[in-house]
């Protein structure tokens, strides 16, 4: 090396790249020490999780929690800026199931169980339960999210009934040290337009966040069959949130308003007003959240949380209208103590859920009012540097369905610095409801209300065990996670025939179960990252001594994602997902299929442009199967198990000020 001054770039897997200046030759041939900071690989273990109620990093939580944050959250937001379907669907063990061929409505399935068994939270508030869960994942935009936390398996001990399959906690951005102003504009080849903006700033004793968006789509029929694959819709969202910071007390107050008009069905009806089948959804959603935390001592905190939700939805088809208003509330007091080795939380909460049908209907009114009163205690105990134990117990009393006792336990063992294993399990329950995927498909027509005298809570027991290994193989970062899971659901609610051509829900006398495994492999080399995931889901009903596949659950699923990233300059991503055949509700089987995608983003200091080629192989159910029987004006829709929108290109610009 010729004498002179050189700039040397030092890098190592798992550590941040660093540039240093050296002089050659070194006069005393001494070694130059370089202090490097932990990079992204380690930062993942340092993410603080809130869904477990006891705020610890992922590395110190016995409960298995998956977190979608940072670059991954941003990349998924580029692909689908208008909602969180893709964000969730591309994780192992999670499938977003389309429940309506024309309205595009979808629910979340975790490990094969229907969407009603998954609890969706916003910053720990249960804002999307019952009737308000309809269209929920289609109306949540990802731009103002900091991270998404997913717990798979029984989690009712944490937040009450409904979390039999698991829970999804959507964690919002909060004001940081630096002001954040961002805007996004996105257009799609399917006639979609997404416009959104986010503002965040912290002042001395106060902070503010503000999110606003407009999302719309023209009716889209790529199969040219005369029915919408993507409906015509227009949605507006506004979400202000105020934060107050005192010496010992902090508070935040927020509100959200979402209004949407959505019309799917006959293209001739939507465009020209001609006769034909249609499904209209008019929704207005108002939610408020209040949180107060007071520091009692150096280690103890008292918290109060309250939320209110008003959800008004009108569903109209040519022969029927379902018009209902749901009002629900959540109030909770908790005492938290963080110790040197053990963390405690003790709390009580009250949930109310009130539904009233509005207008005239030929069906009996499905009105109800449920009140749930809960007490819970939870402890996380670091027994040693290698063993952490988490235990919890909840008691819930539901006014119409009685008392539920919900124990839960999880343990984490650090076998070596690179090898960790977690094992856990618990009980769960779900209050009977008419708001299921099956009822959504028939727009709640000819459906009797829940008979509270003959119905009881659906009860579950489940557990999981995972092994996580991380190391460096030369210049290659390597991590492998393998999960085994099992859930048994006793007396599930099923839809059966009733007199007069009606249908009703009743508890089955038997059970259903789901078991399987998930494998996630991650490799990093330089600017490349490879993610490979495999899910085996063996979900079955066991009714009348007969074992059958649970409908609309892919037994085998493969996720492949290859990313190339030059930090703060360029991102490229290639994806391929495989779904094996699925049993349909009519007893037939759908065909297996692949979905592929490619995205690119070019970044500058204050803005970036992105483009995404989603499903560029144009996989569509209408290519290899039908989505309805009967006539175009009076269709009887079949299960939707594959994409119906086909190949869609979207692209846009993001501005950061």
Task: Label the predicted regions.
Residues 9-16, 25-75, 115, 295:
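Short, acidic, small-residue-rich periplasmic hinge/interaction motif at the N-terminus
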Residues 76, 85-129, 146:
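Extracytoplasmic beta-strand/coil segments of soluble accessory domains associated
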Residues 107, 125-152, 451-452:
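Short acidic/polar hinge/loop motifs at secondary-structure boundaries
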Residues 155-157, 167, 172-201, 228-231:
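Short strand-turn segments of transmembrane beta-barrel domains in outer membranes
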Residues 217-236, 245-303, 308-328:
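Flexible loop and strand-edge segments within Gram-negative outer membrane beta-barrel domains
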Residues 270-272, 276-295, 418-420, 424-488, ...:
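Outer-membrane beta-barrel signature, preferentially recognizing the C-terminal barrel domain
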Residues 382-384, 479-489, 507-584, 654-656:
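Gram-negative outer-membrane beta-barrel transporters
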Residues 488-490, 495, 600-657:
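C-terminal beta-signal and adjacent terminal beta-strands/loops
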